[in-house]
């Protein structure tokens, strides 16, 4: 029999509200609407299908405060992650939303009405401290709107999915599936990465020790920027399944938006798997860790997550399986947890960074590390040969610094090289074609650069070479552009055209600097608006000291050293 849900009752709102579907659907058409983002859709889906039981809606202030302060909902139930719905001041004002209002929650992808929220509270967004490099803090600072609105949900329609539909089990469906298979003890395994031989060995060990079966339950909602896309990962999981003994493992997909919250996230993940019927949950090394902070240090200790779930072991109601990192023993061709390996025994490991480098460069990945069928999928779909991958060259500098001339010359050189299409995004062209309505305020300049980054990222992902040459005077804009392109799997090279301002003015044949000095042009970079020199440029050049030809050659050499041209 499957594990009981967290709180004792599975809050399957879709099933509970089904008898009132026609009534709710009709009402939803008459109400003001909030169009949900991708992350909000992930949260709503797991509220409506019971994955977040005992929640029945988005948190109110008391629940939010209790969860943030001591991992407790207002009713005392353990819950470690705030689940909130944010909305802008404009949405609040336009729809006159206040406590007691009912509002439709709508899917941005197909404009379908999904649920009705009865607002219990509306509160201004709190201000949080924390390291700005943490994904959750970064999301909060850049994406979250002005207000939180909380209240109970009434389900109208389930979300439509068009990928891997047969693998998307709701908690109720997964419980029925376990019952059909006759499974009574289920070990759930959480992952946002491809699985390799070590993961197979770890999950089989856990199942063997507890006489259980395995639920491979990867996240296919929002994960960490730069992660391998879920389409590729699911194909890799499917290729791995036959490596388990027949009937031991099932693959199910979880539409979760991860927060990379380490210890708190581990507790949350355990609750979610309990709601899906699992009796055991694996928590490994650095569970849901976001990587390094702004000081280059890990946000959490490697086993902080294990300590957190151990603290609430009895209350969680799901047995947590704690594992050390496993390592390969070549002399016996087996994997063992590191704490079980005797001193002096030879071990082999490939780090995540090294694996990504090998995939990117096509270097050999040994069978002791991963299965050939998994590697084949990853190489073919997530890491094609470097010489066929796209990239973005982002030139930044003062107006008339020479970046446009460099960009045009580089475009010609890359076209002659062949092998990929080349797109040129000059600052003036983008301003005319994509951003004609924008001015030159700091926010408009930032928006302009983000539009360039969006276009560059999509083209780079498709295998093109993109040369962008805006002034891009602000560090935050350039950093966001790098993250946008890299987040889509593309390589981003920042070239600082560090031509001195005096030289730019002296060689300005159009007289634009002179107009700015006379006050005829306001907010001009270098005159009455600052240019923030890049902190982490991949290449620094100077047209006052170098020819355009030599600078283009430097860029080509940089690309060649990274493997972007065929090597015979």
From Swiss-Prot:
It catalyses: sulfate + ATP + H(+) = adenosine 5'-phosphosulfate + diphosphate. One of its GO terms (molecular function) is ATP binding. The active site is at residues 191-193. Residues 1-162 are annotated as: N-terminal. Sulfate binds at residues 190, 192, 288. It is found in: Cytoplasm. Residues 163-388 are annotated as: Catalytic. Pathway: Sulfur metabolism; hydrogen sulfide biosynthesis; sulfite from sulfate: step 1/3. 3'-phosphoadenylyl sulfate binds at residues 428-431, 445, 471-472, 510. Residues 389-568 are annotated as: Allosteric regulation domain. Its main location: cytoplasm. Allosterically inhibited by 3'-phosphoadenosine 5'-phosphosulfate (PAPS). The record marks 196, 199 as: Transition state stabilizer. Its EC number is 2.7.7.4. Pfam families: APS_kinase, ATP-sulfurylase, PUA_2. One of its GO terms (cellular component) is cytoplasm. It is an enzyme of class 2 (transferase). Keywords: Allosteric enzyme, Amino-acid biosynthesis, ATP-binding, Cysteine biosynthesis, Cytoplasm, Methionine biosynthesis, Nucleotide-binding, Nucleotidyltransferase, Transferase. ATP binds at residues 190-193, 284-287, 326. The adenylyl-sulfate kinase (APS kinase) is non-functional. It is involved in allosteric regulation by PAPS. PAPS binding induces a large rotational rearrangement of domains lowering the substrate affinity of the enzyme. In the N-terminal section; belongs to the sulfate adenylyltransferase family. Homohexamer. Dimer of trimers. NCBIfam families: apsK (TIGR00455), PRK05537.1 (NF004040), sopT (TIGR00339). Catalyzes the first intracellular reaction of sulfate assimilation, forming adenosine-5'-phosphosulfate (APS) from inorganic sulfate and ATP. Plays an important role in sulfate activation as a component of the biosynthesis pathway of sulfur-containing amino acids. This is Sulfate adenylyltransferase.
């Amino acid at each position: 029999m499957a594990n009981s849900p967290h709180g004792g009752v599975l809050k399957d709102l879709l099933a509970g509200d089904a008898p009132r579907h026609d009534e709710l659907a009709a009402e939803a058409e008459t109400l003001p609407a909030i169009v949900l983002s991708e992350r909000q859709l992930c949260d709503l889906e797991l509220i409506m299908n019971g994955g977040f039981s005992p929640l029945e809606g988005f948190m109110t202030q008391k629940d939010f405060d209790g969860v943030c302060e001591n991992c407790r909902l207002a009713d005392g139930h353990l819950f470690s992650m705030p689940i909130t719905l944010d909305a802008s001041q404009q949405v609040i004002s336009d729809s006159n939303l206040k406590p007691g209002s009912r509002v439709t929650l709508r899917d941005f992808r197909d404009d379908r009405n999904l649920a009705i929220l009865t607002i219990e509270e509306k509160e201004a967004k709190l201000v949080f401290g924390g390291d700005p490099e943490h994904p959750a803090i970064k999301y909060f600072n850049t994406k979250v709107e002005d207000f939180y609105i909380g209240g109970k949900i009434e389900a109208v329609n389930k979300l439509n999915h068009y990928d891997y539909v047969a693998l998307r089990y709701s908690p109720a469906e997964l419980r029925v599936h376990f019952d059909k298979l006759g499974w009574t003890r289920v070990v759930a395994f959480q992952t946002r990465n491809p699985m390799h031989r070590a993961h197979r060995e770890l999950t089989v060990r856990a199942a063997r020790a507890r006489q259980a079966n395995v639920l491979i339950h990867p996240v296919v909602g929002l994960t960490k920027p730069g992660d391998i896309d879920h389409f590729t990962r699911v194909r890799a999981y499917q290729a791995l399944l036959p490596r388990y003994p027949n009937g031991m493992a099932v693959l199910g997909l979880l539409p979760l938006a991860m927060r990379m919250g380490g210890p708190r996230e581990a507790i949350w993940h355990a609750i979610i798997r309990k709601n899906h019927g699992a009796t055991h949950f694996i928590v490994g090394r650095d569970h849901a860790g976001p990587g390094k902070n702004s000081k280059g240090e890990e946000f959490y200790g490697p086993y902080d997550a294990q300590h957190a779930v151990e603290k609430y072991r009895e209350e969680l109601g799901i047995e947590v399986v704690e594992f050390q990192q496993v390592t390969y023993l070549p002399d016996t061709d087996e994997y063992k947890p590191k704490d079980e390996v005797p001193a002096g025994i030879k071990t082999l490991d490939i780090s995540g960074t090294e694996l990504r480098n090998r995939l990117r460069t096509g270097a050999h990945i040994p069978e002791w590390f991963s299965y050939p069928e998994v590697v084949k999928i990853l190489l073919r779909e997530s890491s094609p040969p470097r010489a066929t991958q796209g990239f973005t060259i982002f030139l930044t500098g003062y107006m008339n610094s020479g970046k446009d001339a460099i960009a045009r010359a580089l475009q010609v050189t890359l076209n002659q090289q062949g092998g990929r299409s080349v797109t040129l995004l000059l600052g003036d062209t983008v301003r005319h074609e994509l951003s004609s309505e924008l001015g030159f305020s700091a926010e408009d300049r930032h928006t302009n650069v983000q539009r360039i980054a969006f276009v560059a990222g999509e083209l780079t992902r498709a295998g093109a070479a993109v040369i962008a040459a805006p002034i891009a005077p602000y560090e935050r804009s350039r950093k966001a552009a790098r993250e946008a392109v890299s987040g889509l799997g593309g390589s981003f090279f920042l070239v600082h055209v560090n031509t001195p301002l005096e030289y730019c003015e002296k060689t300005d044949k159009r007289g634009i600097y002179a107009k700015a000095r006379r006050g005829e042009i306001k907010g001009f970079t270098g005159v009455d608006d600052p240019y923030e020199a890049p902190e982490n440029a991949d290449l620094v050049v100077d047209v006052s000291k170098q020819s355009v030809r030599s600078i283009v050659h430097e860029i080509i050499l940089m690309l060649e050293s990274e493997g972007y041209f065929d090597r015979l």
